Amino acid sequence: MKKLEERILRDGNVLGENILKVDSFLTHQVDFTLMKEIGQVFADIFHESGITKVVTIEASGIAPAVYTAEALGVPMIFAKKAKNITMTEGILTAEVYSFTKQVTSTVSIAGKFLSPSDKVLVIDDFLANGQAAKGLVEIIRQAGASVEAIGIVIEKSFQSGRKLLEDDGQRVVSLARIEKFENGKVVFGKADA
């Protein structure tokens, strides 16, 4: 997605050898116009897949996921990272390691929101090592639902996430694919859309 790549080049900051900070439009402050366009691109790609739910993980995946769900006309569910006292029964969980935060969290979704008849599109802000998406796939499978595809806003292709997910049989579609960081700059590879 050319507009997304242009925004990354303009407003993204490379930190070290493998971190991209995009807090001005995605991970802290949200550019809803851009998120709406991202949601529409994902909806255009997956509109014939029979998607019944969009699933993401809190927090930065919520904005692109909600606009994708809106464009598809389906509900959006986000996995919670913190234990919630109101979620008391039928909880589906998975362990997820965060590359950026360097911590493992137990993420959860109330089982009543997913059923075996659901065809799920996973949406996330970043793909690095693939652990967040893998955890969501695990939760969706616990519900007996099917994962139709995984939509990623920004993929760091030099990390192992895509391989991990594709080796598990998942279709991965990334709107921006970063091949490498070179001299503090982003070098893009060919995106999927």
From Swiss-Prot:
What SUPFAM superfamilies does this protein's entry cite?
PRTase-like
**Entry keyword annotation includes Glycosyltransferase:** yes
**Reaction(s) catalysed by this chain's protein:** XMP + diphosphate = xanthine + 5-phospho-alpha-D-ribose 1-diphosphate
Tell me, in one coarse class, where this protein mainly resides. cytoplasm
CDD domains, per database record: PRTases_typeI
Q: Which GO BP terms apply?
A: purine ribonucleoside salvage; xanthine metabolic process; XMP salvage
Q: What is its EC number?
A: 2.4.2.22
Q: Looking at the keywords, is Transferase present? A: yes
Gene Ontology terms, MF aspect:
xanthine phosphoribosyltransferase activity
- Which compartments does it reside in? Cytoplasm
Pathway annotation from the record: Purine metabolism; XMP biosynthesis via salvage pathway; XMP from xanthine: step 1/1
**Binding sites annotated in the UniProt record for xanthine:** L20, T27, K156
Q: Which residues bind 5-phospho-alpha-D-ribose 1-diphosphate?
A: A128, N129, G130, Q131, A132
Which UniProt keywords are listed?
Answer: Cytoplasm, Glycosyltransferase, Purine salvage, Transferase
Q: Which domain of life is it from?
A: Bacteria
Instruction: Pull one GO CC term from this UniProt entry.
Output: cytoplasm
Give the family per the record: Belongs to the purine/pyrimidine phosphoribosyltransferase family. Xpt subfamily.
The job of this chain, per UniProt, is described as: Converts the preformed base xanthine, a product of nucleic acid breakdown, to xanthosine 5'-monophosphate (XMP), so it can be reused for RNA or DNA synthesis.
Q: Which HAMAP family match?
A: XPRTase
How does the annotation summarize its subunit structure?
Homodimer.
Matching PANTHER family, A to Z?
HYPOXANTHINE/GUANINE PHOSPHORIBOSYLTRANSFERASE (PTHR43864), XANTHINE PHOSPHORIBOSYLTRANSFERASE (PTHR43864:SF1)
Q: What is this protein called?
A: Xanthine phosphoribosyltransferase
Query: Upper taxonomic classification of the species?
Result: Bacteria, Bacillati, Bacillota, Bacilli, Lactobacillales
